[in-house]
């Protein structure tokens, strides 16, 4: 399952074409719209609102099932010759004190924060990464190699932010999609081409933008969050160490 980046490259079929973040922010300011609003308008110019919403809901559904399966699987060792153990189920049991936080589906009071919220974000990302390594169903967000980051941050929003709701999830995905589109159009999201900065860096930038948006950030603040997300991944390669 792949998130759509169908705000067309030439912009010919959308009401708010943009090819850079400067252009995107200018559109937001001119039309008094959020980044998510801009992307929604562009997407619904090419297909029905019902179809766009259905596809976004499906992305979120697959992400949730992926995290849930990664945290509950009975498989103890990942396939392949390395005999790498799955760590997410034990980590989940420890953080949730052997209860089922994911099944109860809400919120901060249901979770035991043994160290920090970051431990839960780590868990969610690890669960997706292990599902990917085990041949499970994931969302390429934006790639297989970086598939854990966006679901992890989105699950943090869903489970630990008091005002989280379904509309916020849609806003998150639309905003993240705009950032991913700009990276794909102007640079690369391919680890084989530009190293891990192109995969993990892009995913980090997308997730930062999405979280900033659902926490009430302005388009300028969302842009800044996205920039900080990629800045600290620039130069990150995929070279093996050891």
Per-range role (PLM):
Residues 21, 28, 66, 71, ...:
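Generic recognition of cysteine residues
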Residues 1-47, 218-221, 225-230, 234-242:
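Mobile "lid/hinge" segments at catalytic clefts and subdomain interfaces of large enzymes
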Residues 46-195:
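Accessory "access/gating" subregions that flank catalytic or transport cores
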């Amino acid at each position: 399952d792949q998130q759509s980046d169908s705000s067309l490259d030439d912009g010919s079929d959308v009401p708010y074409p943009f090819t850079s973040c400067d252009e995107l922010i200018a559109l937001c300011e001119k039309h008094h719209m959020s980044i998510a609003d801009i992307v929604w308008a562009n997407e619904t110019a090419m297909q029905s609102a019902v179809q766009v919403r259905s596809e976004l809901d499906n992305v979120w559904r697959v992400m949730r099932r992926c995290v849930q399966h990664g945290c509950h699987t009975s498989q103890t060792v990942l396939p392949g010759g390395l005999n790498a153990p799955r760590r997410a189920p034990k980590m989940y049991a420890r953080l949730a004190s052997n209860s089922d936080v994911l099944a109860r589906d809400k919120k901060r009071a249901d979770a035991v924060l043994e160290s920090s919220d970051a431990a839960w974000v780590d868990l969610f990302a690890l669960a997706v990464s292990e599902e990917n390594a085990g041949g499970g169903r994931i969302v390429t967000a934006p790639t297989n190699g970086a598939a854990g980051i966006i679901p992890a941050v989105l699950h943090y929003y869903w489970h630990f932010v008091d005002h989280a709701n379904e509309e916020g999830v849609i806003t998150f995905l639309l905003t993240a999609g705009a950032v991913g589109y700009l990276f794909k159009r102007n640079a690369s999201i391919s680890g084989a081409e530009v190293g891990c900065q192109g995969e993990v860096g892009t995913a980090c930038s997308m997730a930062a933008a999405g979280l900033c948006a659902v926490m009430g950030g302005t388009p300028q603040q969302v842009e800044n969050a996205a920039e900080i997300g990629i800045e600290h991944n620039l130069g990150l390669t995929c070279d093996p160490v050891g």
